[in-house]
Amino acid sequence: MHNVNNSVDIKPEVPLALDPGSPLDLRTDIRMQGSASEVTVWERQLQQELLLIQKQQQIQKQLLITEFQKQHENLVRQHQAQIQEHLKLQQELHVMKQQQEQLEKERKLELQSQERELERHRREQQVLVLRNRERTRESLTGAVASNEVKQKLQEFLLSKSTKDITLNGIPQKITQSSKLWYTASHHTSLEQSSPPLGGASSSCKISLPSPQDYRDDFPLRKTVSEPNLKVRSRLKQKVAERRSSPLLRRKEGNIMTPFKKRALELLESTASSSAPGSGPSSPNGACSALGAENGPSSLPVTTRTERWPSQSRLLGPESSVSMLNLYTSPSLPNISLGFSAASSPISAALGLQEKHVDNGAVSAVIQGLPTQLLGPVPLSVMETKVSSSHQALLQHLLQKEQLRHQKILSSGQSPVHPPSPLAMMENSPSSTRPKLPRHRPLNRTQSAPLPQSTLAQLVIQQQHQNFLEKQKQYQQQVHINKMLSKSIEQLRQPNVHLQESEEEEGEDCQEHAMQEESSPSGGVIRKHSPQNTSRSPTIPLDSHPGVIRVKEEPGASDDETMANQSSYIHQVKGRMVIQAMI
């Protein structure tokens, strides 16, 4: 904006306007006379015109200012309106975005709710399908028996079994005529409930029923306590027939055939007809338990089981069943401490030979039954497998055992070891039944079972002879080392211990000769210690803490005294060897 307030005074020297009607006067006189008055008028006119011009300028200036102000106000209003419109647009956009986000969230929630509803609907359908299946199964199989019904059925079975026992007059044993019906609770495998080591369990003392008993006499209605009992029994039977034991390999001879079943039935009929007044048979449960634990058995663990001939029939009508009640396993320790008289395997074999039964039936039974049910192999079968070289050794062992037994009886001392099976077989008369020997009580539990056959005894004899040879070589080596140490000492101190060394050499030679003539009968591991020298030679061998007896065969008294003397002499030698080495 230009500032128009500054006023400019203009005084023109030449008159701007002249009257057009007046003629031009060229006279100088007249001009000079009238110039003063005209100049003043003209100046006044000029001043007035200037004032008018100034006023006009001011008016124009004000008009311009007012127009500018109006335009400025209009522009400001337009700008504010534009700004407000822009803000409104932004707000609307923000609102639109928020609405879109909310719509998206709502859509997601709706989708999730729909998925949940679908899953819920699927679950409900599955539950309905399962319920329908259960209802159809229940309708097909029938009602499931309750626990009270099972308990009443068990009580009835127990009462019936006790009645059968009391009628026969034998409260502790179950006769052949007693019949027991098993419910679904008794259909458990022998592996799940194995008998304890101390004796046979209650389930092993009950004879399993035969399929004939089901057909002849069945006092109760055949109810099913579980819906899938038939399927389970079939599956258990298949598993029992096809399963292989981890302890022993399955053999083809263990599988039951119809011919073997007929032989077993024939043996039962002959045994019951030949000895009607004999005592009750031993339980078959122990046989089945032993067979199932010690190896694979062909007995299915179901209600329809075949009857095996009990071991009491094989051993004899009056033989005890203490060996049957004892649970034995080759992988478990043999605990016989505090155990009463038990039959040895050879006496069982003798009882089997004395039993007057058809040879064909007995051979069929022996071929059909597994080795775990028949117990150890009889002596007659074992001797066929032994070669001719072993027979001479068996005769020698038998003669030695008889001599030892006669010496013990003549001296009147109680035998330390029980009589061997060979001596019992020779001394027992054929008319009378052989008495069962007693087990020697063990001081501690052995990790391996006792030898139960002649082959095991032969193996132990060979091991003992090898041990004696190694011990003799060791003694010779000790003697050589002792002689070397003595020679070294003599070189170091030739004058001091000359006489003592000569005497000791003479004694050592005599003792070595005596030792070669009569070696100790039992293998002894000697621990040389300096404390043994202070003791007198009258102390027996067992009292020394440095002597550990591994095994000793009882021989003559002279042999024992010589062994004691040689052991003490070897202890003295050991002390001298240690001194020489130091």
UniProtKB/Swiss-Prot annotation:
InterPro entries: Hist_deacetylase_Gln_rich_N. The keyword Flavoprotein does not apply. Residues 189-254, 270-314, 409-447, 496-567 are annotated as: Disordered. The gene is hdac9b. It is found in: Nucleus. Its EC number is 3.5.1.98. One of its GO terms (cellular component) is nucleus. Homodimer. Interacts with mef2. This is Histone deacetylase 9-B. Residues 270-289 have a biased composition (Low complexity). Belongs to the histone deacetylase family. HD type 2 subfamily. Devoided of intrinsic deacetylase activity, promotes the deacetylation of lysine residues on the N-terminal part of the core histones (H2A, H2B, H3 and H4) by recruiting other histone deacetylases. Histone deacetylation gives a tag for epigenetic repression and plays an important role in transcriptional regulation, cell cycle progression and developmental events. Represses MEF2-dependent transcription. Its main location: nucleus. One of its GO terms (molecular function) is histone deacetylase activity, hydrolytic mechanism. Residues 189-205, 295-314 have a biased composition (Polar residues). Residues 213-224, 238-253 have a biased composition (Basic and acidic residues). It comes from Danio rerio (Zebrafish). Keywords: Chromatin regulator, Hydrolase, Nucleus, Repressor, Transcription, Transcription regulation. It comes from the Eukaryota. One of its GO terms (biological process) is primitive hemopoiesis. It catalyses: N(6)-acetyl-L-lysyl-[histone] + H2O = L-lysyl-[histone] + acetate.
